[in-house]
Amino acid sequence: MSAEDLEKYETEMELSLYREYKDIVGQFSYVVETERRFYLANSVEMVPRNTDGEVYFELRLADAWVWDMYRPARFVKQVRVVTFKDVNIEEVEKPELRLPE
């Protein structure tokens, strides 16, 4: 496989992943971003921890979807993430009424 073939394959996978995301984002309540991953989840718990002066965050997600094109199964029941970096958690805005497109 040439470098060009690999790049084309990765581009197609990324586009497919984006389409999947657009189809399912409305089924989730939260968007969670860490330095390594992007998640959609229906339940998020974040607990700041402090061990010997080192602050880190423990995240527990339930009913989640992981943005990862190399993962064959992106839906997971439970996710536990430990990170020393920034975490962004946003509630997904759900409009009261959806008009047909």
UniProtKB/Swiss-Prot annotation:
Pfam families documented for this protein: DUF2469
Key words of the record: Acetylation
N-acetylserine PTM positions: 2
GO CC list: plasma membrane
Name under which the protein is recorded: Uncharacterized protein Rv2901c
Source organism per UniProt: Mycobacterium tuberculosis (strain ATCC 25618 / H37Rv)
InterPro entries from the UniProt entry: DUF2469
